[in-house]
Amino acid sequence: MKKIAITFLILLFTSDISFSKITGLSYGADNSKINLKVYSSLTCPHCAEFHFRTLPKLIEAYASKNMMYIEILDFPLDYPALNAAKIQKCVNNRQDEYLDIIYKTQSKWANAKNLDEVNNNLKKISTKFGISSSDFDKCLTNKNIEKNVLQSRINAQKNYNVNSTPTIVINKKKYSGPLEFDELKIFIDKLL
């Protein structure tokens, strides 16, 4: 009986990805004076540029000092972006690393002949995060995860009239387009 209980516990904690808590990626203290939301699509080249050029500077200058809370939020523009965002939710505490790879290889995995090929490309990437083929399929077909990703887009449209990516919202004020760090710094420093 003891062996059965131990085996059950091992299977419970190692066999499947946990979908109980769907979280996104954030930096800084959530009670900071400045709240910056980044609405992005994982197939958007300007979002990739923002991710590599501007976001690290914002994290270093503000979020790392708890002056700003940065939320990376989903605004998928197409099915490949939707599916990539769903898989992001399944890599748990490695989402930042996942986004690095997704954005670096964006032109390879996203530019496929069809959605099945996109999904196969995403499956190959997900193996780097320990996601098995069956867990990948479960993640991709999980309705709660899909609802979470799509609700982020709906909220962005409803609350901020977001219609393109990347869109930055600083304390509920919207800024669209690929803004550079120096441009955002002007807006941010006025709020400090």
Predicted segments, located by residue:
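Extracytoplasmic thiol/disulfide redox context detector
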Residues: 2-82, 123, 127, 145-160, ...
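Cysteine-centric redox/oxidoreductase cores and disulfide-bonded domains
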Residues: 76-164, 169-182, 186-192
